[in-house]
């Protein structure tokens, strides 16, 4: 089905202004003709924050209990020794210091996540213009600067997603694949929303989780009725 027909099919099944129970929202997305690839199920969460204020920007990470359905390649900056061994044992594709930095500068950037131990940031700092624009720069707020690189690697590979409010105060994130069963997708969404609630800025006033909508890779969003979720 062409994308325009797909969008129309989903739009026709959605009543304007209506919020759907999570299971019904997912059913609408799944019953539309699938693309030739397994699509992701994405979520957009509008938060009650003023994203223009630095103290109301929300940024962090969540380990989705059912995973993301994606294979994740991880590079770790850690000095030779116990920390490097820990990262390798956890499944990191590459571990190093200056040698790893040189490989990246030479064009080896085939990684989805870059992790660093605190004492390795002196090396990583030199790669800011290379890693920053690609969203790969390690940051303690999302767990990618860690004194426990083995744990950080396991989190990245087991379904960790990172989020950050955009200019409109909206979080965009993947919660799995269309091939996941409804309960897996629901548990992932609930885990994300619970972490967002924990990250609520102290200066945020009024309703915090203002709107939650789900969509498939090539489809429009369907608003989710938050009362159909367990957020306690």
Swiss-Prot record:
Pfam families named among the record's database cross-references: Ribosomal_L1
Keyword Cell cycle: no
Swiss-Prot/TrEMBL keywords: Repressor, Ribonucleoprotein, Ribosomal protein, RNA-binding, rRNA-binding, Translation regulation, tRNA-binding
GO-annotated biological processes: regulation of translation; translation
InterPro entries the record matches: Ribosom_uL1_bac-type, Ribosomal_uL1, Ribosomal_uL1-like, Ribosomal_uL1/biogenesis, Ribosomal_uL1_3-a/b-sand, Ribosomal_uL1_CS
GO cellular component terms given for this protein: cytosolic large ribosomal subunit
GO terms, molecular function: rRNA binding; structural constituent of ribosome; tRNA binding
Subunit annotation: Part of the 50S ribosomal subunit.
Family stated for the protein in its record: Belongs to the universal ribosomal protein uL1 family.
Function (record text): Binds directly to 23S rRNA. The L1 stalk is quite mobile in the ribosome, and is involved in E site tRNA release.
Protein name, as recorded: Large ribosomal subunit protein uL1
Organism placement in taxonomy: Bacteria, Pseudomonadati, Pseudomonadota, Gammaproteobacteria, Lysobacterales
């Amino acid at each position: 089905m062409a994308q325009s027909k797909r969008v129309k099919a989903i739009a026709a099944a959605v009543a304007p202004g209506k919020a759907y129970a999570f299971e019904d929202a997912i059913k609408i997305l799944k019953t539309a003709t699938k693309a030739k690839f397994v699509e992701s199920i994405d979520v957009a969460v509008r938060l009650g924050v003023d994203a223009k204020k630095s103290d109301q920007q929300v940024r962090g990470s969540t380990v989705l209990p059912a995973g993301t359905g994606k294979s994740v390649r991880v590079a770790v900056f850690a000095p030779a020794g116990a920390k490097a061994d820990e990262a390798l044992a956890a499944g990191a594709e590459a571990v190093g210091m200056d040698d790893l930095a040189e490989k990246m500068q030479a064009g080896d950037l085939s990684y989805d996540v870059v992790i660093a131990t605190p004492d390795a940031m002196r090396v990583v700092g030199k790669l800011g213009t290379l890693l920053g624009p690609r969203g790969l720069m390690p940051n303690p707020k999302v767990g990618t600067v860690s004194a426990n690189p083995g744990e950080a690697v396991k989190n990245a590979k087991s379904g960790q997603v990172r989020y950050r409010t955009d200019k409109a105060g909206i979080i965009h994130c993947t919660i799995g694949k269309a091939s996941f069963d409804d309960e897996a997708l629901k548990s992932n969404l609930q885990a994300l929303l619970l972490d967002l609630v924990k990250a609520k800025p102290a200066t945020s006033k009024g309703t915090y989780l203002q709107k939650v909508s789900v969509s498939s890779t090539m489809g429009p969003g369907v608003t989710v009725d938050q009362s159909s979720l367990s957020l306690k």
